[in-house]
């Protein structure tokens, strides 16, 4: 039995890291010199498979859309409350 059979995750799966909620696509599964299995995501970070959960791909895009909506809402509220000022600096340039 190969180490890929020991992991219920495969290359191409979309997963979430349960400790932080980081989501990504599995690009590789590796075994290190100590025999530990690592799952490599498209963010080039390696995770232990028991800390990952396979999710539906649509959860990735839903999360991004949620974040975009929250950012827009916060910007709008801050503009209305005067905390955020919309400035046009014209053709200002840097150091001279």
UniProtKB/Swiss-Prot annotation:
InterPro entries: DUF2098 (IPR019209), UCP037053 (IPR017099). Pfam families: DUF2098. It comes from the Archaea. This is Uncharacterized protein MJ0157. The lineage of its organism: Archaea, Methanobacteriati, Methanobacteriota, Methanomada group, Methanococci.
């Amino acid at each position: 039995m190969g180490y890929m059979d020991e992991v219920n995750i495969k290359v191409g799966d979309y997963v979430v890291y349960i400790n932080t909620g980081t989501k990504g696509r599995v690009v590789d599964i590796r075994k290190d010199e100590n025999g530990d299995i690592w799952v490599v995501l498209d963010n080039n970070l390696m995770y232990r498979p028991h800390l990952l959960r396979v999710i539906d791909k649509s959860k990735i895009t839903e999360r991004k859309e949620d974040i975009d909506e929250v950012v827009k809402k916060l910007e709008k509220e801050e503009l209305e409350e005067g905390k955020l000022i919309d400035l046009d600096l014209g053709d200002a340039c840097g150091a001279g």
